[in-house]
């Protein structure tokens, strides 16, 4: 049978080389993965010997002394020592707060007996008594008066051979050095208003911050060193000193090191990231009440913004990882609203935004180290989506929100429609926010996260502001661009090609001949016959087959097959007899509808959910058991083969995903039969379940206890012609018992006879299965 292709893909082993494994790992995004290849993370191949490059000969030393400054009058900055260095005796400095404090400092040379000298202080001629008994030290004397016309009184002295004194304004006080060197120490004498206290210096001076008080004390006691590192070579006016808060430039290019061929450049950039989510909403076939999938898709977005008066063109790609699958089943009837799967991102999810712009920083982004970024948070709020049902009120899914917080940045490659770009990938972790999301007219409410149904909420884009910095090894010649080698990237975006291929595959369903499909489904398709219609070389077919097997081995079907034993045992034990006692013996569809109220409705829905889970595992059991009957997988493989032959867009890169996806998504509404003498049990993945007699097609009570025993021992058959179709065929056309048995066993010869006779019921059923072969 045609499903042989799926069995071969699962059972055949394959070989691969390490580069294939690395590329495969690189294309998958996983959470909590840190790559540390050394001091540099590169997207290509770094030089074999990468040194630090050329280093400057000189060493920059932060100046200790801020000065010297010319004699002047100023409002001394708070928390700064004013270190005064006079060269001769006389008035050194004076100051006042203009209300109740006037102070002055004079310098007296050695060997001066008690004498009276005249000084000009505060604009007045003042007679002061001074003395200095030392023969080697000079004496600084501090005088203070409390009224404008009061008398100056001596408060403190400092004896030193170095002719250095210092004072400082701090905490509304004036601090001053006193005593004799080398044991002079600081003290305070005045309480003043710092804001209005001016100081006038008659000698050159330096400014030393309070944090370097120990250095100032060393100068007072030991003098200035013979050679000083000063801010100014010669004394300058204090107005040339402008104390400003210096902030790092956000957008700058700094040369770290340089040789003849290479240089290291540090790029600092502010950044505005704008991104959008994309989604896919797929409606199931049938009456129009079912949706098969609502999922997130990668989204490219291009925009411009202004950075330092320069217009920047940027490109982002947004994708998600670690999604959570939800579903909703409103009931067992074909007119009950249901969503087979819809994706929601929550705390365990990640959002990836790949960013590139046309600035110099991205021109040679091949060899990069010291990559860092700081970004703001952003809240993404979901909008509303109305599910348009053919009849009745429309359910509306609305709400949901998550907060995106930066969780790291790494190198990546964006694949646009025309070019691949080395870019930065920003990773965001998620936290759920208010409001929760719900589906109106259902019991699904109060769930937190952001559903894929309308993640942008009619917003043009989401925006994040921040900055990044990196050091890149680039050619010394700015006109030369580093060639980009084949990269091992964090993600490779083939979604555009796959999207176009999916659309083509879905449109080809109408071109498939039903009778030819049955013939093809009975053929033992192997891997090479499956790919025989694809124009390619023999080597390409071998490589393609290997890639298909690798991808198929990680598909949902392959993972489910590996756990078949545990799945079947769990499925069998999950359906309990007690779970359907409240339903009783359900014989007709009308009776089932009449019982769907209150507790009976809830019990029916519980059984429907459990039966749906069992039916999925029945597919696995049938898949591992080869029979001569036709199965859903035979039809699925035949449709796949037909579409591959007709496709014009299939390629070696997209083939593995298409093969794996078809095994998971083709014919989502399947039913399976279990044989029990003259009784057939039929259960569907959509939750429907029937038990009926073979000879009359009359429905009988569904014996759950008997069903539990049969699902582990009896053979499983695909209900290609399901119970409703058989009953409709028998009621309208009448069929023999032999035909009934062959249709129940999905005999391909009998199916083809009905199709060739243009039986509308059988033909419509097969056409419906073909229409369900969608991606």
Swiss-Prot record:
Residues 510-775 are annotated as: Spike foot. InterPro entries: ConA-like_dom_sf, Rota_A_VP4, Rota_VP4_MID, Rota_VP4_MID_sf, VP4_concanavalin-like, VP4_helical. GO terms for cellular component: host cell endoplasmic reticulum-Golgi intermediate compartment; host cell plasma membrane; host cell rough endoplasmic reticulum; host cytoskeleton; membrane; viral outer capsid. Disulfide bonds join 318-380. SUPFAM superfamilies: Concanavalin A-like lectins/glucanases, VP4 membrane interaction domain. HAMAP family: Rota_A_VP4, Rota_VP4. This is Outer capsid protein VP4. It comes from Rotavirus A (strain RVA/Human/Japan/K8/1977/G1P3A[9]).
